Amino acid sequence: TSRGLGDVYKRQEVTGKSFIEVFRNEYGYLLDYVDGNMMDWSVRPNMIFAVAFDYSPLDRAQKKQVLDIATKELLTPKGLRTLSPKSGGYNPNYVGPQIQRDYAYHQGTAWPWLMGFYMEAYLRIYKMSGLSFIERQLIGLEDELTIHCISSLPELFDGNPPFKGRGAVSFAMNVAEVLRILKLLSKYY
């Protein structure tokens, strides 16, 4: 019924407003998580999903602010960092004993699979004018295809230069995201 759809649209609007009120901060990026009065102000890549997905409560200007911060603080030639160097606890090097590597995993290493969602977000904002930037970003990943495991990408990279590949030598999720982005780019050509 039309009344039922009205309720759905009303809930959608309320949910979107609530999302913005809870997660968007005055610096233009999204809080990583909120649990009651506890808020994580760390700049992390989770916020890029709110820009990349078809349906987002953010308007275009808000999406651009999130993308700009991700570009400045998280983007590397090999993927998005899991934590900004400006945030506390930054540890970009996936080295040492298992416990040390486990700590670094979410504290600044760069994950190639996140680059797919970043690129999708970039194209949502810049459309055709963003294509050359996206192609340049793919070069950083293309170079890796002959280094670790032929035609594959490693699990992650150190978050700082020289962005050394670490973890599993072949990680399907990373390869899948590159293929997904290449398919997305083919729609523009």
Residue ranges and their predicted role:
Residues 1-9:
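Single conserved hydrophobic/aromatic residue that forms the stacking wall/gate
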